[in-house]
Structure formats: structure tokens, C-alpha cells
Design a protein with these regions (language model features):
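ATP/Mg2+ or Mg2+-diphosphate-binding catalytic cores
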Residues: 112-167
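An alpha-helical support segment within catalytic cores of ATP-dependent transferases
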Residues: 1-28
Length: 167
């Protein structure tokens, strides 16, 4: 229906061959506001490490940016702050590789949310605002990957109709 084809990750398999070889680290890979805690000493703690793995730190940064959904200005500031704090070995092709990982995160969300969102729309009642946020998130992700893999694009209103129909 969406035009993802039988090999939706084919683009990413090919494009991953151009990623820069940088030092790998233990990464969380699921950092978002719900997985970051501050204790009474104002010390940060990262919880829920079930997706932790050994890999490219840029994947972890992209996953955080994708899941946290910063405003564009905040996103740019965060990326610049991160770049300022990283050793030189992590900065080669930073922007290009980060964009790859952001697209990869969008693809993963589309695949997961195409199944998940109709189910949760059927089972739960959301405010109109929350429905709009979920549909905008979905359509933004689908529209982001469309030029890369040739799938459909959508609007938040159309996504809502799909979720209601599929649920």
C-alpha cells in the first residue's frame, strides 16, 4: 500500500557502504526524555539499556534527535554542542552520516508505526492534539524517506484516515 516494496531497506543497505569508519562505542540507541533521569544531586542517569549495543555514536545521536523531536532551532544548537564536545575522530563526515542515520530512524518508525498506530488508535482515546501529533510524526517520517525509496507521501489528515481505516 505504501510502496515500500519487498526490500524496504535496500536503499539503506547500499547507502551504509559510504558511512565513515569511526571509533565504535557502547551506545544506548534509545535516548529520549523518558530514558534520561536527573537525581537529587543534579547528576544525569540513562535508564532502559535494552537496546544498547556497540556501534557508531552517530546512530545514538540520531536516535535521540529522532525520538525527542526537537524544534529545528534546538536541533541545530544541540548538534553544534555535540560537535564541540566530540574528539576529532568522530567529526569526519559528521553531517552526512548523521543524515543517513536520521533517515534510517525515520524508516524504522514508518515500518513500526504503520502497524502500531492503527492498533493504538483503535484501543485508546486520544485528544485531538495527540492524534494530530502522532499523524504529523508519521507523515513527516514517511515524507522524509519517500525521495530515498520511492514510497508514497502523505498528509497528517490522510494518515489519520488510514489509521482509522486500518484499525
Amino acid at each position: 500500500f505504501l510502496g515500500l516494496g519487498t526490500e524496504p531497506y535496500a536503499y539503506f543497505k547500499q547507502a551504509s557502504k559510504t558511512l565513515t569508519d569511526r571509533p565504535w562505542r557502547l551506545i544506548h540507541a534509545d535516548l529520549h526524555r523518558g530514558n534520561i533521569m536527573v537525581d537529587h544531586h543534579k547528576k544525569l542517569w540513562f535508564i532502559d539499556w535494552e537496546l544498547g549495543l556497540y556501534g557508531d555514536l552517530l546512530l545514538c545521536i540520531a536516535a535521540h534527535i529522532h525520538r525527542t523531536r526537537y524544534y529545528e532551532r534546538e536541533r541545530k544548537m544541540l548538534i553544534e554542542d555535540i560537535k564541540q564536545g566530540l574528539p576529532e575522530a568522530f567529526l569526519k563526515n559528521f553531517d552526512k552520516d548523521l543524515e543517513f542515520y536520521l533517515n534510517f530512524e525515520a524508516m524504522k518508525s514508518v515500518i513500526t508505526d504503520t502497524y502500531r498506530f492503527p492498533e493504538i488508535f483503535k484501543e485508546e482515546r486520544f485528544s485531538a492534539k495527540k492524534e494530530a501529533e502522532l499523524c504529523m510524526y508519521y507523515s513527516d517520517n514517511l515524507n522524509k524517506i519517500a525521495p530515498l525509496i520511492g514510497c508514497k507521501t502523505t498528509t497528517p489528515d490522510e494518515a489519520l484516515r488510514w489509521f482509522q481505516e486500518w484499525g
